[in-house]
Amino acid sequence: MAVSQKEIEFNFNEDKMRLKIRALEKELEKVQLGGGKKRIDKLHSAGKLTARERIKQLLDKGAEIQEIGAFAGHGMYAEYGGCPSGGVVVVIGVVSGRRCVVVANDATVKAGAWFPITGKKNLRAQEIAMENHLPII
């Protein structure tokens, strides 16, 4: 049986989409490093945890986690070295059996300094918490 033009087009589009998803996943991996490996190592050498590590310890083990706004600040503030995730990590997760919004400043991004996008992301986290009747930590 011959392959139809629609099937060929579908497969072509599927391949393009898979490539785009993979590129997005790679970019997310970079963003999740915050200010970079060097700053993470510096934090660890001082006996401190990153924002994502602190959040992971706070949340119930095995519960679903949804990060919000991972690409906030992406491509912004290049003149200042960038602002991955807006300098703040926001997740919806479960703490002691209760779904919560958790916000943690990322000290690897400009030592935790705030950019305008940081404030916007914090406000959005508060709005999400209020709209969904979730406690915010």
Q: Across the structure, where does each feature detected by a protein language model lie?
A:
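Terminal-region recognition feature
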Residues: 1-137
